[in-house]
Amino acid sequence: MIMEAINLEKIKTQMRKGVLEMCILSIIHKKKEAYASDIMEALKEADMIVVEGTLYPLMTRLKNASLLNYSWRESTEGPPRKYYTLTDKGLSFLNEALASWNELQTMITKLI
């Protein structure tokens, strides 16, 4: 019984990881631009809790893949902030990911 619970948690974690990039890109696209705490807040509101130690390396990976750009802006609340925007490649990737997500949902719905 305990082994089943461990496997279920592992499966749930893997499913979240599998869609996290798509969710982050979607948040940035909806907001037009987003600061890291905006992204974390949106994920939290959707009950997708992500820690900074997960988010920042992922953002770097998306930037290195040319899916995101960023710019620094002064902040009245402290140090300058890094704001992210989607590149054209990022938007294309997001659209393809969303199409794949919709196909997957359709397939799963037929099975359950």
PLM region descriptions:
Residues 13-54:
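N-terminal helix-turn-helix DNA-binding core of bacterial DNA-binding proteins
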Residues 91-112:
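Amphipathic alpha-helical dimerization/coiled-coil segments
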Residues 55-57, 61-62:
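Basic amphipathic alpha-helical segments that dock to polyanions
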Residues 76, 80-98:
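Basic, amphipathic "hinge/linker" alpha-helix immediately C-terminal to the N-terminal HTH DNA-binding motif
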Residues 23-26, 41, 60, 95, ...:
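A cross-family signal for key residues in well-ordered alpha-helices
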Residues 1-13:
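Short, Lys/Arg-enriched N-terminal segment that forms or immediately precedes the first helix
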Residues 65-79:
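Beta-hairpin "wing" of winged helix-turn-helix
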